Amino acid sequence: MKVIVDTSVWIEYLKNRPSVTELIDRYLLTGKAYTVGPVIAELLQGAKTEEDYKTLNSNIGGLPFIETNLDDWILAGKLSFKLRKRGITIPITDCIIAALAINHNAAVMSFDRHFQSIPDLRLETAPK
């Protein structure tokens, strides 16, 4: 199964948090870890130095990538619309990540709890 690793998990991975690095390294070796545009943009924007930016950019390029298509954008809007009707506001970038997971038969691994509010989204448990 494909797992879209969210930015919150990658941040802990880059901090060398043992429980996270162990699991993500296993996913990387087995080809389960995938990335998407919003995660790449968030990681790159958070780089502290030019050198960090270059390293991140180089390493991200080696991950399996799920492209965003029109159906994904439409589903992201629909998810956001339905959640807001229930009084739940989630960043549109996370709605896009959820839409990509739903439309492309993947799960999402994240430390962000708001993903739990999204119907039909499979979640992969992030390590403690």
Write out the residue ranges for each language-model feature:
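Alpha-helical structural signal
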Residues: 10, 24, 40, 93-98
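Active-site neighborhoods of divalent-metal-dependent phosphate/nucleic-acid chemistry enzymes
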Residues: 63-109
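Short, well-structured N-terminal submotif of metal-dependent ribonuclease cores
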Residues: 1-35, 44-58, 128
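Residues at secondary-structure transition points
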Residues: 18, 30, 34, 38, ...
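Generic structural signal for small/hydrophobic residues in well-ordered secondary structure
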Residues: 6-7, 43, 76, 101
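Acidic, PIN/NYN-like endoribonuclease modules and their adjacent C-terminal/linker elements
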Residues: 1-2, 98, 102-128
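Acidic active-site catalytic centers that drive phospho-/nucleotidyl reactions
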Residues: 6, 94, 112
